[in-house]
Amino acid sequence: MPARVLRVLVPALALLAGAEAGTAGADEISLVDLLRSAGDYVIGYADAFRLVVAEEEYVQRLRTSPGGPVQETRRLGSDVVFVHVSGAGFPWWLLRDVYEVNGSPVRDRQARLEKLLVGPMEDGLARARAIADEGARFNLGRGHWNFNVPTLVLAFLHPSVQPRFSFAKKGRATIEGRSFVEIAFRELSPPTVVRGPDSHPDILAAGRVWIHAGRDGTVGRTELTLEVREGRATTRATATTEYRPYPPLALWVPVEMHDRVQTDVVGARGPSNSVEVVDGLAAYSGFRQAGVSTQEEFRVPEPQPR
């Protein structure tokens, strides 16, 4: 069976949290206004989240059927960096540098990405991306894949990307005491945001996003579904990201991501059992700006005397 490869075409984005004041009910704000607010929010966020570094603890479990016994568990420790790339069409990439697998170091933890990116971006970006691609080989499963970016869905809300998708309001939810509107999305046509293998390069994305019911565009949760067919094999990938307020940064940041990659094979007599199922749970912490120590994490600016 051909190796599974999912590659992200656009940079991952994140959103700046807004104030709760002025919240409108889900029935009081139109879908157009919600999407406009989210798009404006993404644009305004570029400076606030530039070169943000975080720590990722990622546990993956491999099964040979859904709900079956775990065949293998892998625990990955990584540094992740959200970087701004001028002229790339979208403002954000997420780069992952694995430093530990199952408690054993795979390299010296020396903030490699951070050191590359605090200097001239043009000089360090190519090497940083090579490091991130190298880390994809530590994922469990038959093929290398890197769709597992917690902020990927936020890219779909960028004003230049929204026309590629259809959106529909579905319901409401309360997250951290705030009212959010559930919106379903579906990618309309190629070329697609997420790229597949050469034999099937276009992978149409679908899912849901929860946008604050007010006017600030804050996203509290995202859900992504991808499906790729190669010969007799069908791979379905899902990822759900939870966001929470992070006062030191004055942002809503991704704190947890659940993902699943499931591959099934169709034989001459119909579907067989799943070839493999990989479930992942990633947790994020230690958000700070590149070049700033964890003891010097961002602080909300103090009011200045007039």
Question: In which residue ranges do the predicted regions lie?
Answer:
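Structured extracytoplasmic
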Residues: 25-206, 214-220, 226-237, 246-253, ...
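N-terminal secretory signal peptides that target proteins for export/translocation
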Residues: 1-5
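Bacterial N-terminal signal peptides
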Residues: 7-20
